Amino acid sequence: MSSVSNDSPPRGFVAVYAFGYVGAYVALITPVATTLALKVAELDPAGKESTLGLVSAIGALFALVSNPLAGALSDRTTSRFGRRRPFIAIGTVVGVAALAIVGFAPSIPVVVVGWALAQLAFNLVLAALQALLPDQIPLVQRARVSAVLGIAQQVSPLVGIGIATGVMATGAGMGPVFVVPGVVGAALLALLVVRLPDRRLEQAKPFVLLDLVKPTPGTGADFGFAWFGRFFVILGFAIYTTYQVYFITDRVGIPTEQVTLVQLAAVLVFSLVLTASAIVSGRLSDRLQRRKVFVYAAVVVVSLGMVLLAFTTTLALFLVAAGVIGVGIGAFFAVDLALITDVLPDQEHAAARDLGVFNIANALPQSVAPAIAPIFLAIGGGGNYTLLFLVAAVLALIGAALIAPIKAVR
């Protein structure tokens, strides 16, 4: 049976699919957005910036390997439970256990081990989730569904930070701050596991490790331009997300104990404008069957938000900048995922593998951003967030420029 859907998905599936996305990202992005930085600051307050960079980079490297490997294996899985369901289930269980290791870690080395395992496990989940788009959603609906998934992904920090803030208010310590969002995420993913109309593959060619790096037949320049375009946009955005906590405390001057409340306000603003932007962009993109013009406009708006952030010193301006970035990134995630699935060379037999390769463009910036950011922060005596976010704006614009040569989509 073909793995590419030409029929509308079952009633209610898109909602369950979106809840699964929320679950995965509540578990994984809550640490990225706030709690991992707080855990590192608790264990190493003097060297928190460089230590966070190290922990984030190692975790991102594990994500880098896990996603395409899981995708290739998922494409070949002949389990009676389907091709995608086993990876979602196993990755979720292991991921929640890994979050517990991070939360209760007594030292930075234990944090590194736990976070690497969490990234590996949840990228098993993400590889399967992304493959459901070409598996279950017809081409003419993909931008709209991508918009819903983009909203789900970006609303997840709001849910996760809200949960983390509530847990922190109880004085329970950092362990439950990691575990509780993970358990909530697992519950949402369990709903998808139960409801997923997963197709069973009757026969598959053997897995060869070389397949991870060997291009899928039909892969052309469009695939490469789409990959590098996303990489640079996400790299600019990753600088914002990775250093948001320290920007709030060091530049805006918010006390550490109030950081999660400020982040909650920022994510609320971010999520509201993102939702509106994603819905409008996704519908227009599907109606017009155009992708690139929406990506260009989205990235310009993201870059404007980064420039505003570069010169921000007050809480009010920080929230405005978060809103501007939300408008742009909402449109970007809504349309770019649809663009990516449009240029996949073999949607029937290698969708998860190729989407896993594309997800490297999501994961690798999480490693590169904390590696390069301290260089710019250190210029001029340290804490140079102005230069850092100007660089982030330029990186995003480079990503938009790389979309232009793509020929398979308009």
At which residue positions do the language-model features occur?
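Loop-to-transmembrane helix entry/capping segments in MFS-fold secondary transporters
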Residues: 47-50, 139-148, 260, 346-358
